[in-house]
């Protein structure tokens, strides 16, 4: 009979962005008294990265452990966004069950689908938590039906379809097995009990030879690279001589210098660990995700973890604009290269191709969000760099060129559905489903080429006056769609001079389009200062000051009034970029510019490009 470790449960918490997953983990930590009562629990304690707290999303998978009635529950908090799906897949290997958190109003979303599919593929036991039950608009019964439909659609087996449901309000710290909000108890005990009763305990085969697989990486200046993962078999102690089976089939021997266990939000040093434990190991600088650690006399690697390939790439290069070096600490090409290579130490979904010239680096990731988070992180660390427009990665599958397609789910007021359907049809999207979800809202589901979505979210927000919600996730590679993908790109207003933008100049040119800079902003020749109302680029002089004369004008006492400029965020700037433009990123500024700054040289290059296109 198989021996089990009844004192442990390993679970992952999965959910769509913003359905309350991290808040739920915070509450479980608080109610299990894992966190010191004197330390005031920081809201969203599991999101330790500044960007995660600001954006309210989880980017990196985290692990923590809580003790409940003598059982240790290891909880993996996973990202809910497909751009960080590389993290999700690996965590599924470390756990025996999943807690699926679903919003009591929004129900199942594309991300829920993406993450749940990964969990069911690994044969994990699911538990469903319907969160935000206290919302006036909550519809728990319908949401549970939607979840069941999704399980059936994703091919869940009979055991997985018998999932238990707990209803909760994580923010209030209440839960219950009843879907009536009035029955909510001021405790998370129903969730803890359901986890212990339904999630299988890990197999205790600690007397067999060690097998430990690395699922996540961390880096520490004192001990170097750290491999985080699960012991599938055997026992490991500090000082053990072990063998690392590399991805390429080679092996390396090393001594375990430190072992870490997880207690609450802390990582503490331990002396030994056995089958079923989630731990971190240090001692091998060259360790990578998917590799297996075994005893030197019994090398038996586990199957390598497959990581989804990147779907989007962009060029990174050192800043060479006229304002280069003014605002950043790290401005050279070598510094940018070192930082990108350092990112590869922990982010396995990222690819960096240094290219022959070493000046330009092709960086590939899982989506716009994945790459924009990297750019924002580098900017905050004091780097100056320039990036090109994102482009999708074309793959050849069985001799056919294929491009990535995304599954898009849109919730919008009914009156905007016509213009959305038209816009996505122009971008070669196919509508898969359309349903009314009450309150005058329509849910639309499309399959759209990923390149058709680059730059679409800003257009979508203005099209729906900010009332629409769009979520999309990578679906599959399909043959490349012929022809141009719609979504007309408007031209840019390009500065033809260097200096400071003046109110007088902005007043004269604002009727030509939308201005991106405030009066007094320093600009340079070739910098984009606005969006043209037409499709062509237009050179403008934004630095002219009003001529002073000693003649009193009849309009002398009029005050200059200009429209508020549209200051672009990092994501909006990326979406605005055209093929011949760069986004310049520094710790203090985000600027858009033409790759060729001089207008005459730019015109010559465009002519050459046009001739070459005609010759083809």
Residue spans for each PLM region:
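Structural and coupling elements of P-loop NTPases
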Residues: 1-616
């Amino acid at each position: 009979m198989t021996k089990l470790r009844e004192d442990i449960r390993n679970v992952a918490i999965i959910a769509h962005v913003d359905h309350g997953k991290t808040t739920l983990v915070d509450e479980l930590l608080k109610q299990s008294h894992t966190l010191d009562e004197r330390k005031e629990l920081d809201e969203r304690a599991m999101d330790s990265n500044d960007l995660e707290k600001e954006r309210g999303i989880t980017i990196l998978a985290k692990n923590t452990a809580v003790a409940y009635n003598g059982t240790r529950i290891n909880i993996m908090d996973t990202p809910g966004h497909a751009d960080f799906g590389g993290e999700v897949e690996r965590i599924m290997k470390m756990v025996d069950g999943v807690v699926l958190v679903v919003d009591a109003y929004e129900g199942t979303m594309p991300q829920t689908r993406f993450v749940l599919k990964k969990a069911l593929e690994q044969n994990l036991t699911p538990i469903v938590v319907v969160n935000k039950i206290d919302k006036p608009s909550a519809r728990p019964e319908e949401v549970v039906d939607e979840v069941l439909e999704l399980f059936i659609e994703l091919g869940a087996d009979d055991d997985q379809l018998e999932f238990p449901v707990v209803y909760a309000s994580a923010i209030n710290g209440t839960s219950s097995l009843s879907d009536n909000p009035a029955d909510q108890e001021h405790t998370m005990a129903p969730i803890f009990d359901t986890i212990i009763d339904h999630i299988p305990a890990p197999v205790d085969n600690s007397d067999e030879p060690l097998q430990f697989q690395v699922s996540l990486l961390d880096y520490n200046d004192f001990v170097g690279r750290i491999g985080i993962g699960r012991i599938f078999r055997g026992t490991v102690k500090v000082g053990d001589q072990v063998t690392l089976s590399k991805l390429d089939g080679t092996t390396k021997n090393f001594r375990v210098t430190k072992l870490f266990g997880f207690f609450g939000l802390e990582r503490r040093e331990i002396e030994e660990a056995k089958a079923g434990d989630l731990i971190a190991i240090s001692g091998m600088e060259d360790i990578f995700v998917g590799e297996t650690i075994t005893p030197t006399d019994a090398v038996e690697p586990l199957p390598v973890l497959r990581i989804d390939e990147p779907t989007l790439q962009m060029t990174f290069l050192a800043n060479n604009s006229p304002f280069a070096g003014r605002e950043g600490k790290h401005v050279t090409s070598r510094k940018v290269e070192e930082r990108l290579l350092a990112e590869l130490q922990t982010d396995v979904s990222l690819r960096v191709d240094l290219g022959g010239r070493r000046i330009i680096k092709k960086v590939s990731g899982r989506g716009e969000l994945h790459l924009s988070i990297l750019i924002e992180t580098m900017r905050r660390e004091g780097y100056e760099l320039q990036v090109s427009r994102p482009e999708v990665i074309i793959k050849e599958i069985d001799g056919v060129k294929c491009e990535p397609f995304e599954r898009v789910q849109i919730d919008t007021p009914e009156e905007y559905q016509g213009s959305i359907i038209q816009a996505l049809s122009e971008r070669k999207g196919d509508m898969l489903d359309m349903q009314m979800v009450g309150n005058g809202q329509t849910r639309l589901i499309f399959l759209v080429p990923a390149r058709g979505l680059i730059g679409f979210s800003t257009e979508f927000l203005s099209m729906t006056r900010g009332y629409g919600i769009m979520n999309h996730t990578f679906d599959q590679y399909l043959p490349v769609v012929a022809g141009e993908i719609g979504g007309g790109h408007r031209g840019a207003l390009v500065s033809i001079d260097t200096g400071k933008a003046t109110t007088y100049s902005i007043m004269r040119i604002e009727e030509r389009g939308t201005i991106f800079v405030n009066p007094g902003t320093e600009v340079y020749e070739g910098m984009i200062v606005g969006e043209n109302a037409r499709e062509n680029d237009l050179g403008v002089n934004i630095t002219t000051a009003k001529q002073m004369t000693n003649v009193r004008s009849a309009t002398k006492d009029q005050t200059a009034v200009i429209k508020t400029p549209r200051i672009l965020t990092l994501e909006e700037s990326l979406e605005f970029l055209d093929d011949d433009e760069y986004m310049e990123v520094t710790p203090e500024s985000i600027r858009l510019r033409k790759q060729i700054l001089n207008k005459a040289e730019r015109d010559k290059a465009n002519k050459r490009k046009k001739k070459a296109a005609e010759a083809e």
